[in-house]
């Protein structure tokens, strides 16, 4: 026996068939209490529901069930007060809670695990925890969407450049750009709600994998824990973590949207763009350059997204080769989800704060909107509507006019009518009406377009939805 071995199993929950205790290294790799103690509230909620059901069905004496329920509340209060004696030797939150319950109420604590396994217990705890996080994500997304709506409403008719390839494309409005993110985060909100609805089935009572011979009432515990129904197949209930993967997938898509917006805020707040000014509350300075005001919140959001993507991939890799039902590999599911949830909630809160506090520079936006031949498409459309040119010919004529303006180092509205007629003789003076950026955005009245009237309709629709 090595120095790291224990002479007898230190775990009284499952050690009956073992002659020797686990090696200290085995205890270290096997223990999850360092992270799964975050599920203490969920574990105790599940155990209290199970205890109440055991008493109601007569599987245990009602007095024992009551003692278990009250004792579990005492355990919860100790954990919340920060003076609970967590033990690595007891491996996880489930055994730590049960061991402490036995110290408090004695022999009845040993009846709590009747008709239950750690397999369905941990699946229940984890589902409850993920469900709580989905609710928190929903609240965070709603706050961000409302902040974006406020920005969109304030600048519904402020002209700015729209980009493709980060090159000037067409004029749009600030409100239209903000509403694009409202739509993206709105779909994230829908995915969060869908994921919550799909996962809301209770694993409790599935036991190890095959169910139990005790006359338990799974519908009772499901209802007590706020689930819509018990999971229909006990083997599936303890085997899969697709609810956690769906959370991570949903979080990854939302994080991607946050990262794209963060990237734009980094660019827009630079001295080269000056589209927005971020508040001091969400910026930092430099230790050597006194003039610096850095968009660190946006940059950190952009970086944290990688951790969320990584968590999704990591859990996929854990689950991809596991036969049914439970394997110890699945203990590695929680840290990924915990970290992703923490970083997503922090990123949502930081983005909401930045959006709420940032100030758009209307003058810089308008000036940039008129550069880069942004109304070239309006010119091509005018050639089609007024002169009857096929669009491909209009596209070619407009390209030639852009080349002429570039050669003259001017923008399209600065060309003379004579310049334009040199490219196409049919052009009339009315063409200048479509070359202004204000007229350009006002003309985009198709459903979902950038015209202020359409932007305000979009805002009103979202206000009503929320």
UniProtKB/Swiss-Prot annotation:
Catalyzed reaction equations:
2-(N(omega)-L-arginino)succinate = fumarate + L-arginine
One cellular-component annotation, GO? cytosol
Q: InterPro entries, from UniProt?
A: Arg_succ_lyase_C (IPR029419), Argininosuccinate_lyase (IPR009049), Fumarase/histidase_N (IPR024083), Fumarate_lyase_CS (IPR020557), Fumarate_lyase_fam (IPR000362), Fumarate_lyase_N (IPR022761), L-Aspartase-like (IPR008948)
One Gene Ontology MF term: argininosuccinate lyase activity
Disulfide bond positions: none
A Pfam family that this protein carries is Lyase_1
Pathway-wise, it operates in: Amino-acid biosynthesis; L-arginine biosynthesis; L-arginine from L-ornithine and carbamoyl phosphate: step 3/3
PROSITE patterns linked: FUMARATE_LYASES
Q: What are the transmembrane regions?
A: none
Q: Which UniProt keywords apply?
A: Amino-acid biosynthesis, Arginine biosynthesis, Cytoplasm, Lyase
EC main group: lyase
Its Enzyme Commission number?
4.3.2.1
Q: Where in the cell is it found?
A: Cytoplasm
NCBIfam families cross-referenced by the UniProt entry: argH
What PANTHER family does the entry give? ARGININOSUCCINATE LYASE
- Mind telling me what this protein is named? Argininosuccinate lyase
What is the originating organism of this protein?
Roseobacter denitrificans (strain ATCC 33942 / OCh 114)
